[in-house]
Amino acid sequence: MNLTKQFFKYVSQNIFGLLGTSCYILADTYFISQAAGTDGVTLLNLCLPIYNFIFAIGSMIGLGAATRYAILRAQGEERAAQRYFSNAVFCACLLAVPFVLVGIFCPGTLLRLMGGDAGIVALGIPYARIFLLFTPFFMCNYIVSAFVRNDGAPSLAMVATLSGSLFNVVFDYIFMFPMGLGLAGAALATAVSPILSIAICSRHFFQKDNTVQFVRQLPSATLLGQSCQLGISGFVGEMSSGVTTTVFNFLLLGLAGNVAVAAYGVVANFALVATAIFNGVAQGAQPLVSRCYGQSDRAGARKLLILGSCTALALAAMLYAVVFGMTDTLVGWFNSENSAQMARFAHNGMRLYFVGYFFAGFNIVAAGYLSATNRPLEASVTSICRGVAAIVVCSLVMSALFGMNGVWAAFPASELLTALLTLFLLLRKKKQTV
C-alpha cells in the first residue's frame, strides 16, 4: 500500500475513533440538559477542564511512549522499544492516584475551585466523585489505544473506541432515566466506557502479529521523561481545551453569569468534536511519520505533513459550513428550557469561535508532526503558544475591548498567531534533516 493510501486509512480510522470519544461527552451534555437544564450544562462545563487534564496526561504518556516505541522499532532497537509500554501503564496508574483521592475526599472543593456556586457544587458532587475514581482507566485507555495503533492495528483501536463511546451513549440514557440515577448515572456510564475500550484493544496482545510486550520492571522516571518529551504536543492539545474553558468560564461568569457559561457549554462541547477531528488527523499520521523518520525517509515525512495540512484545511471548511448553516438547530439540542438569552449567546459564540479551526487544524497537525520527527522543543513551543499563552492573552485583551464577542473571537485570533509562529518554525528547519 502506498504512503498516501496508508495515510488516509490511518487518519480516517483515527478520526472515527476520536469522534466517538468526544461524542460521549456530547451525549452527557444532551442527557444532562434534559435532566437538569442550564444548571446541568453549567456543571458539565465546569467539569470539562478536569476531564481535559486527565485526558491530557493519558495522551502525553500514551502518544509519547508509543512514538518512542515506533521510532526505536524502525531503527531496529527492539529491546529498547519494549520497555516503553509497561512503563507507561505503571506511571499512568501512579499519576492517577491524586485524582482518585480527590474524588474520595473532596470533590466539592474541586468544583468550588472551578467556579461553581453552592447550588452547582451540591448538584455536581456525585458526578465528579464517580468520574474521578475511574481516572486510571481513562489514562490507560489512551496508552493501550496508542500502542495498538502503532503496532499496525488502527482498525481495532477504532472499533474499541467507538464501542466504548456507543456503550456510554446507550447507558447514559438507561442509567439516568429508566434507572433513575440522575447525574450519577451519567458519570457511571462515562466512567465504564474506557474499560470496555481497553478490553477490546487488549485482544491485539494475543494475536500472532502483536509485537508489544509487557516487561516486568520498576517504573522509570527516565523513560517517562523521554515519553513526555514527544507527548507534550498531545498534552497541550488536550489541555488547550481545558485552559480555554477555564479562562472563558471565569470571564463569562463576570460578564453575564451562569447563562453565559451554559451557552459556552454548548460551544465547548461542539468544539470538543471539532478538536477530535483534527487530533484524529495528527494522531493517525503519527505512526507513519515516525516510521519515515526512523528510516531517514525525509521526503515521505514531508509528504505526510502536506497531506495532513491539506486534509485539515478541507475538514475545517466542511465543519464551518455545517456550523454556519445549522447554528440554531445545534444550539437548540441543548436548550431544553428554551432560554432566549442562552440561545442568543450560543448562536454568536458558535459562528465566531469556529472560525478558529481554519488555523487550529494546521497547528494541531504541525505539532504532531514535530513530535513524531523527534523535535520536542519546537512541538512544545507551538503547543504551549496555542494552548496557553496566546489564548489567555487574547481572551483577556479582547474581552476587555469587545465584551462577550471578544471572548468568542479570542480563539480564532490566538490560533492565527500560533499558525504564523508554527509556519516560521517549519520553514526555518526546511533545509535540515527531518
Predicted features and spans:
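Small-residue-rich hydrophobic transmembrane alpha-helices
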Residues: V41-L101, F138-A157, A263-T327, A360-T382
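Hydrophobic/aromatic residues in alpha-helical transmembrane segments
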Residues: S12, D28, A65, C106-P107, ...
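Helix-loop interface residues and adjacent transmembrane-helix termini in multi-pass membrane transporters
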Residues: L26, A35-T38, L72-Q75, N150-D151, ...
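Hydrophobic transmembrane alpha-helices of multi-pass small-molecule transporters
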Residues: F53-A56, N168-D172, I198-S202, L272-A276, ...
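Transmembrane helix-bundle signature of multi-pass secondary active exporters and lipid flippases
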Residues: N14-L63, T67, F131-F138, G225-R291, ...
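Short runs within selected transmembrane alpha-helices of multi-pass transporters and secretion channels
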Residues: G62, I130-R149, A157-S165, A186-A199, ...
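Short alpha-helical transmembrane segments in multi-pass integral membrane proteins
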Residues: M1-N14, Y69-F134, P178-I232, V289-G356, ...
